């Protein structure tokens, strides 16, 4: 029987994390972080089943290399407490085969995130013993890309207000103006 589990995290410099380090961990690779000069080596980590970088069609092709992608993200974010990535860790059903896990994740990521302009770095882990705890790591860029391949603004909060039975969505700036009225 499939057991549901989903963990959602933010990779942020403010919490002492690095997008390059998180990507090296999930892909069991060795990546140099150009931002701080630290090399993150997780090549001895076991249990990697599959890994892939998904890009929108207008992203630079060199970003297929996860080291280049996440170093570009680190370079673009300037502040010491920048949010660098979103990470999701879903459990995978043991009733499915690894090929079915890949198909499930590929469809979900392409339709939910890449179609919205985000880059996704994905890996499936099945630690020892196999079939004991299969799960995926999905890292997403916080900023989507526009059609020219430029970073857009980070997602803006939208507030839903109900007044006299009428619902209306507001961005933070619109909400401040509406409050003044």
What is the role of each PLM region?
Residues 1-181:
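N-terminal nicking endonuclease/strand-transfer module with a His-rich metal-binding environment
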